[in-house]
Regions:
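Terminal amphipathic alpha-helical/low-complexity segments used for targeting or macromolecular assembly
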Residues: 1-86, 195-204
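Left-handed beta-helix
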Residues: 86, 91-92, 97-98, 103-112, ...
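Accessory, usually C-terminal, subdomains that scaffold auxiliary metal cofactors
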Residues: 163, 184-185, 193-200
Length: 204
C-alpha cells in the first residue's frame, strides 16, 4: 500500500493508495470493520460484496481504485451503476483513507480532488465541492452530519464534528464541534464521539 501525506493545520493526514487488489481488499475490510467492529477475512469480504453486488457501493468503489486489467473495467461499470442507483457522486479517483462510513448511502456529491482521511463518517445530502480553488482536505475521525456543504479550499482537522445543515466556509479546528450558516465553533467537548469502531493504521 502506498501512502500519500497531506498537510492539515497542525498535523498530516495519511491516505492509503492501493497498488494491487490485495490492498483494495484491505480497504474494504476497514470499511466493514467500521460497521460491525469485526475484522473479516478476505473471502468473507468478497462473498459479501458479491452477495450484495447491486447495493454495496463501497465494495465497488474500492475495487475501482486499482486501475488495471479487465476486472477494473467491470468494477468501474458496477460502481457507476450502483452510484447512479443511490444518487452518489464520488469519483473513483477520490483519495479516501481507511474505514469510510456512508450514512444511509444516498444523495452525496463530492469533488474528485477532495482528500478524505481515515475513519470518516459521511452522511446523506452532503456536498463537498469547488469551482476554482483546491477542494477540501478532511482529516481523521471526522463526522459530517446530513445536509452539510463544504466549500473549496478549507481544512477540516482531526476529530472534528460538523452539525447538520452547516455550511463550512473556513477551516475547522482539531477536536471542534461546529454548526450553523456559516459554521462556527460551538465547543471542544468529547471530540469524534460519533466515530465508532475505528480502524487502526500504522501511520496513526
Amino acid at each position: 500500500m502506498k501512502i500519500e501525506k497531506y498537510n492539515l493545520e497542525s498535523s498530516q493526514v495519511c491516505i492509503p493508495i492501493p497498488e494491487n487488489y490485495k490492498d483494495c481488499l484491505t480497504l474494504i475490510k476497514s470499511d466493514r470493520y467500521r460497521k460491525t467492529g469485526k475484522e473479516l477475512s478476505s473471502m468473507s469480504v468478497i462473498l459479501n460484496g458479491l452477495k450484495h453486488f447491486n447495493s454495496d457501493i463501497l465494495f465497488w468503489f474500492r475495487l475501482s481504485q486499482y486501475k488495471k486489467g479487465i476486472l477494473w473495467a467491470i468494477c468501474r461499470l458496477m460502481y457507476a451503476h450502483v452510484s447512479q442507483r443511490y444518487q452518489i457522486q464520488i469519483p473513483a479517483s477520490t483519495k479516501i483513507g481507511y474505514g469510510l462510513t456512508l450514512g444511509h448511502r444516498t444523495c452525496m456529491v463530492i469533488n474528485g480532488g477532495t482528500i478524505i482521511g481515515n475513519n470518516v463518517n459521511l452522511s446523506q445530502f452532503i456536498n463537498i465541492g469547488t469551482n476554482h480553488k483546491t477542494p477540501a482536505i478532511i482529516g481523521d475521525n471526522v463526522y459530517i452530519a446530513p445536509h452539510v456543504s463544504i466549500v473549496e479550499d478549507v481544512k477540516i482537522n482531526n476529530n472534528a464534528t460538523i452539525g447538520a445543515g452547516s455550511v463550512v466556509t473556513r477551516n475547522v479546528p482539531e477536536n471542534a464541534t461546529v454548526a450553523g450558516v456559516p459554521a462556527k465553533v460551538l465547543n471542544y467537548d468529547n471530540p469524534a464521539r460519533y466515530i465508532l469502531h475505528r480502524w487502526e493504521t500504522k501511520e496513526q
